[in-house]
Swiss-Prot record:
GO terms for biological process: cellular response to acidic pH; cellular response to aldosterone; cellular response to vasopressin; intracellular sodium ion homeostasis; multicellular organismal-level water homeostasis; regulation of blood pressure; response to hypoxia; sensory perception of salty taste. The chain crosses the membrane at residues 56-76, 543-563. Residues 135-222 are annotated as: Gating release of inhibition by proteolysis (GRIP). This is Epithelial sodium channel subunit gamma. It comes from the Eukaryota. Its main location: membrane. Disulfide bonds join 100-284, 208-215, 261-268, 373-458, 395-454, 399-450, 408-435, 410-424. Phosphorylated on serine and threonine residues. Aldosterone and insulin increase the basal level of phosphorylation. Residues 579-593 have a biased composition (Polar residues). It is a multi-pass membrane protein. Gene3D superfamilies: Acid-sensing ion channels like domains, YojJ-like.
């Protein structure tokens, strides 16, 4: 064998064999871990320290277990041929139903409090339209019809004015007949009465502050609206001074209002209703309220399985100046919700059967940062003065009532009282009407800041209502039906009933299909991680293990090396400072003593294997050895061992 071949065979014999030709399984696994694209296996081999190796072993085994589990689920799901059928019969909670008579108090019970006000109102109607009191009222002897000898107290507090379009800036005082110059703001309010011909006269009233220097005039195209608004202001002032217990007694009891009651085909009575006193509608009664032990539910749809009541309206006890329609008001709401009957209540007619079909819709919105809604109102800086769950309407009215107490010194009569506040009245707060109207105009123009502070509730229920009417009772059944109801209510009603005194109401679910509207984030954490993983895997072939490697190298090892270098520099600086400077010149270092000599701790190559260590006790010469031609081995290993090629001869 040639000398070159012998040296080559000897070097191959001494060098370890790597790769698929490795002699042992340990060497094979070592080669695999060093050359595979699976990141975790390589980190197990190259990591220094027992703790890091254990952590990488745990990470890798966990990833392998998750892969096996997910793949097994996918395989089982693929080969499983089955279907699932779910049959669900649901019951829907029946909502709370609040019923009020449109007339808040019996006229016979409050007539003593309203005698002077009604007399002045009659005079205004007589002067404007020639309207006189009905014969029925006169025969009842309710009150005098003239104001002879009586000072016009209410006209003096809020003067009624008649405006003529031909005379700008002037108005005629309704009581004295004198013309006066109108200064300040003139606010025209729309009328809800239809006019075929446009009227050239406007009726209104003037509100002034205490010093009468600042006034506001409100005009109406219809005198009916002007007088009703004027009457309502005085009415609220009078009723605000009446104790609550007395007002409850002056209104309708549950036994008077409710003639018959059925729910889901079973009889119910006044005990199933809860009293709720409303400032503007008197005694109202709520069916299926939150104060009940259990919330009633229904398992069937249709008119036969809802709430059926017959109401006694008693038109003879209506206040002719406060309300101009006959019937009842109904509101469907949640059990913990305040019934804003004056805003969203439905009116039902007398001598009619009103059927209301419901369809439930639940809405769930996402809170911040997806929307500006609130979960329970705790993050809204407005005190809830209602004994009910938060809603946007409650927040707006609470905000306005709080501003009313701050600006005017008293609370508006139609809303609940804030803590340590009283309702407005002339005696204690003579300026409250002007203050209230000015504040309300600012509220409508969104100048109080309530609309910007209050938020919509994130979750709420609403019922889509379908209303149908039918004449009730029919002519064929009217006689016997009214006789039976009169006999049945003889203890509560001391007169023969007629159909204009009664109203029938049916409230039911059209079907039990419940619609839910739920918001969900378009981009969730899972979606974000999935998108990141897809991009990293597509462009860099990177996985979760690769991310952990990056964290280890660039956030742990990187800063550890920097800190270690700074620490060594500090130690060297401190050592040089402590050691006195030496006068001896350092000897030149050559060979292995030279710091420029690179020592490699990696696996041996042919070049490093040929670099034999010096003999013990020998010194490395400072001059290079002579060039002997017998040591030239480039021809022997020119094709195999390129590392031994020497430089060109000098």
């Amino acid at each position: 064998m040639a000398p070159g071949e012998k040296i080559k065979a000897k070097i191959k014999k001494n060098l370890p064999v790597r790769g698929p030709q490795a002699p042992t399984i340990k060497d094979l696994m070592h080669w695999y871990c060093m050359n595979t694209n699976t990141h975790g296996c390589r980190r197990i081999v190259v990591s220094r320290g027992r703790l890091r190796r254990l952590l990488w072993i745990a990470f890798t085994l966990t990833a392998v277990a998750l892969i096996i589990w997910q793949c097994a689920l996918l395989v089982f799901s693929f080969y499983t041929v089955s279907v699932s059928i779910k049959v669900h019969f649901q019951k829907l909670d029946f909502p709370a139903v609040t019923i009020c008579n449109i007339n808040p108090y019996k006229y016979s019970a409050v007539s003593d409090l309203l005698t002077d006000l009604d007399s002045e109102t009659k005079q205004a109607l007589l002067s404007l339209y020639g309207v006189k009191e009905s014969r029925k009222r006169r025969e009842a002897g309710s009150m005098p019809s003239t104001l002879e000898g009586t000072p016009p107290r209410f006209f003096k507090l809020i003067p009624l004015l008649v405006f003529n379009e031909n005379e700008k800036g002037k108005a005629r005082d309704f009581f004295t007949g004198r013309k006066r110059k109108i200064s300040g703001k003139i606010i025209h309010k729309a009328s809800n009465v239809m006019h075929v011909h446009e009227s050239k006269k406007l009726v209104g009233f003037q509100l002034c502050s205490n010093d009468t220097s600042d006034c506001a005039t409100y005009t109406f195209s219809s005198g009916i609206n002007a007088i009703q608004e004027w009457y309502k202001l005085h009415y609220m002032n009078i009723m605000a001074q009446v104790p609550l217990e007395k007002k409850i007694n002056m209104s309708y009891s549950a036994e008077e209002l409710l003639v018959t009651c059925f729910f889901d085909g079973m009889s119910c009575d006044a005990r199933n209703f809860t009293l709720f006193h409303h400032p503007m509608y008197g005694n109202c009664y709520t069916f299926n309220n939150k104060e009940n032990a259990t919330i009633l539910s229904t398992s069937m749809g249709g008119s036969e399985y809802g709430l059926q009541v017959i109401l006694y309206i008693n038109e003879d006890e209506y206040n002719p100046f406060l309300v101009s329609s006959t019937g009842a008001k109904v509101l469907i709401h949640q059990q913990n919700e305040y019934p804003f009957i004056e805003d969203v209540g439905m009116e039902i007619e007398t001598a009619m059967s009103t059927s209301i079909g419901m369809h439930l819709t639940e809405s769930f919105k996402l809170s911040e940062p997806y929307s500006q809604c609130t979960e329970d109102g705790s993050d809204v800086p407005v005190t809830n003065i209602y004994n009910a769950a938060y809603s946007l309407q409650i927040c707006l009215y609470s905000c306005f009532q709080t501003k009313m107490v701050e600006k005017c010194g008293c609370a508006q009569y139609s809303q609940p009282l804030p803590p340590a506040a009283n309702y407005c009245n002339y005696q204690q707060h003579p300026n409250w009407m002007y203050c209230y109207y000015q504040l309300y105009q600012a509220f409508v123009r969104e100048e109080l800041g309530c609309q910007s502070v209050c938020k919509q509730s994130c979750s709420f229920k609403e019922w889509t209502l379908t209303t149908s009417l039918a004449q009730w009772p029919s002519e064929a059944s009217e006689k016997w039906l009214l006789n039976v109801l009169t006999w049945d209510q003889s203890q509560q009603i001391n007169k023969k009933l007629n159909k204009t005194d009664l109203a029938k109401l049916l409230i039911f679910y059209k079907d039990l299909n419940q619609r839910s509207i739920m918001e969900s984030p378009a981009n969730s954490i899972e979606m974000l991680l999935s998108n990141f993983g897809g991009q990293l895997g597509l462009w860099m072939s990177c996985s979760v293990v690769c991310v952990i490697e990056i964290i280890e190298v660039f956030f742990i090892d990187f800063f550890s090396i920097i800190a270690r270098r700074q620490w060594h520099k500090a130690k060297d600086w401190w050592a040089r400072r402590q050691t006195p400077p030496s006068t001896e010149t350092p000897s030149s270092r050559q060979g292995q003593d030279n710091p420029a000599l690179d020592t490699d701790d990696d696996l041996p190559t042919f070049t490093s294997a040929m670099r034999l260590p010096p003999a013990p006790g020998s010194t490395v010469p400072g001059t290079p050895p002579p060039r002997y031609n017998t040591l030239r081995l480039d021809r022997a290993f020119s094709s195999q061992l390129t590392d031994t090629q020497l430089t060109n001869e000098l």
